[in-house]
Amino acid sequence: MPVLPVPCRLPPDRPARPQPRAWRRWVLIALAALPLLAGAKTPPATPDPLAGTRQLVVVVPAGWDTTQARLQAWQRDAAGHWQPQGAAFDVSIGRAGSAWGLGLLPVPEHAAGPRKHEGDGRSTAGVFAIGTAFGYAARIDSAMPYKAAQEDSYCIDVPASPLYNTLVDAHVVGAEAVKGSTEPMRLDLHHDGDIRYREGFVIEQNPQAVPGHGSCIFAHLRRKPGETTAGCTAMEPENMQRLLAWLTPEAQPRFVLLPQAEYRRLHAAWRLPALQDATK
């Protein structure tokens, strides 16, 4: 019988070799992917808008038109968590409620609520630097920079003035420069012993002094519970004294005012204390 050729087979215990062309194709694909892998980066973490800040003064009214609110002070601990400082207390705000101001963070896109303008009787909502303390006494118990107000000290609330939204002394800038201002800083000397500016601090609303966007926003004293303001935040003397004694410029203190609904919406993105704690 003729001998038939035996088919070429690999031994059963040896794996089949890949075809040379297929092997080269996979190597080329892997090499082509290397630049893409090298260029891939982990998305950066969302920056903390309050980075560096270790003290917060938080004011939360119920709504935009509410004239009363609760204030809670907060200190950031070594682990980065906000811890309440003392008990929350009642404060009064603008006679017309509050409105978005010009602070350290932009007004959120599509945010509800009014915008602050001069003379609207609304306190400013947002996050603001806490500026200089001021008062009638030569000095106070506070580490904050302090301005001892004089009879001719004014905050300029005239939008057309080049000194708009600035604390000045008439004997320095001239009497004509303070003409028209309705904010003498020695209210006691101009209005029969008025105590409201006896102690307080500047809330740095509209630091670029954009004309008409609100000026001379302070935290100051109130003469009686429930007394509203022209746009400031007012409290009892003992509460103001505790705040001023606690605040330090090294902690980069910030003032936060947000109605409850906005606070709930923004507290995570802005790294604020939880609302249920902020309003106790």
Model segments located where?
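Bacterial N-terminal signal peptides that target proteins for export
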Residues: 4-27
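Proline-rich low-complexity regions
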Residues: 20-22, 35, 95, 123-124
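Bacterial N-terminal signal peptides
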Residues: 27-35
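Cell wall/extracellular polymer interaction/catalysis modules
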Residues: 41-230, 238-280
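A conserved hydrophobic position in a structured secondary element of the catalytic/binding core
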Residues: 235
